[in-house]
Design a protein with these regions (language model features):
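ATP-dependent phospho-/nucleotidyl transfer catalytic cores
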Residues: 1-22, 30-33, 37-39, 59, ...
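Activation of the activation-loop gatekeeper triad in protein kinase-fold domains
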Residues: 40-44
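Active-site activation/catalytic loop segments of kinase-like enzymes and analogous catalytic loops
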Residues: 49-84, 98-115, 127-134
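Histidine/acidic-rich helix-loop-helix segments that form or flank divalent-metal centers
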Residues: 83-91
Length: 160
């Protein structure tokens, strides 16, 4: 799996050249004076512009349907169509979403085992669904999908 993660990272195309919140999801957004504001920015850095988009759209804490996910993605892509190639954006978005959700599964599992914080375990099946959503139609994930299917059968992932 590590080899596949390195392969995916090597296939990111966008430069690390923009502010990235790194924890950009609905719970860290607030309305302030009729504007949208972010909180919890201590982990921000310069990174890939698709990272926060993946964090927001494929947020494990906020279940949304594919139609809404596509609307948000398409809105962002349209706003940035002169700056970013569509194929490049989608590639990086899907890779970062998959890697982020794999990391989330690991963190939530560690919290349960090490710290006895089991409340996050209920979110893991949705993380798997988000991973599945992104890898099912993209050939770049073929080997990773095979490894995940071999090591984490759908029964374990709670996917039906």
């Amino acid at each position: 799996i590590n080899k596949q993660i390195k392969f995916l990272i090597s296939n990111l195309n966008l430069k690390n050249d923009t502010f990235v919140h790194r924890d950009f999801h609905v719970s860290n957004l607030m309305k302030y004076k009729k504007k949208l504001a972010t909180i919890d920015t201590q982990d921000a850095l310069i990174g890939n512009r698709a990272y926060d988009l993946a964090s927001l759209i494929d947020d494990v804490r906020f279940k949304s349907n594919k139609k809404l996910k596509d609307r948000i993605y398409n809105y962002y892509a349209k706003l940035n169509n002169k700056k970013i190639n569509k194929v490049t954006l989608l590639n990086d978005f899907e890779i970062l979403s998959v890697l982020r959700n794999m990391k989330i599964i690991g963190i939530f599992t560690r919290l349960a085992i090490r710290d006895n914080k089991t409340k996050y375990l209920k979110l893991i099946p949705y993380s798997w669904k988000l991973i599945e959503l992104r890898i099912k139609n993209n050939e770049i994930f073929h080997n990773l999908k095979s490894l995940l299917d071999l090591n984490f059968p759908k029964k374990i992932r709670n996917l039906k």
